[in-house]
Amino acid sequence: QVEGFDAGAKAAIIASIAFGVKVVAGDVYHEGISNITASDIAIAGRLGYVVKLLGIAEQDRDTGEVAVRVHPAMVPNEHPLASVRDSYNAVFVEGDAVGSLMFFGRGAGGDPTASAVLGDLIDAAVNRDQGTHGSLGAFQRARVRQIDATSAEYLLALDVLDQPGVLHSVTGVFAEHGVSIRAAEQELSLIHISEPTRRYF
């Protein structure tokens, strides 16, 4: 749970159903919450965000490549996913025709688990009685886009000396590496950057 492997398995299943291709757990990039600190959560709160462990599945409409990843993300307070807490889970879907949809409910506990297992048993019994194997056919293996080729926004918090010119020096390092800075707040030593990366926060 903490390192996102459970969420990754769920994301692989959802991606397979959503995109009609076979995605397995090994295709999913994982980054858990064990490195998230109280300071990270406090900074996110000051900026109007909450930190959530998200499973994200995307498909490139041009290439058909699928990217599935699990990592901590800063979710705006006004986003529906920000209110998902405790034993509740949510699936947030964006589609061309339907726009944004969210499916919300309990994802843990005796009753929800028993309900899901019972539903699977009923499906299996119906399929056996009808001589079928369900409505999903055999999927072809997904073309997976690796995390190195995935671009996302993230926030970098730096502890720096409180003296003139420090922020200029920091931004100069990013400029040397071709990283654009959208916004910076020196009081909190925060820099918002956008660049393909292995780390997402």
Spell out what each predicted region is.
Residues 1, 56-58, 65-161, 167-170, ...:
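Catalytic, metal-anchored helix/loop core of enzyme active sites in primary metabolism
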Residues 1-83, 88-90:
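Substrate-binding/catalytic subdomain of NAD(P)-dependent oxidoreductase enzymes
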Residues 4-8, 33-37, 110, 114, ...:
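Generic structural signal for well-ordered, non-membrane alpha-helical segments
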Residues 6, 10, 120, 162, ...:
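Acidic active-site catalytic centers that drive phospho-/nucleotidyl reactions
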Residues 19, 125-129, 201:
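Secondary-structure transition/hinge residues
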Residues 40, 170, 193:
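Aromatic/hydrophobic pocket-lining residues that form π-stacking "cages" and hydrophobic walls in ligand
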Residues 48-49, 175-180:
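Short secondary-structure junctions
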Residues 191-201:
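Single conserved hydrophobic/aromatic residue that forms the stacking wall/gate
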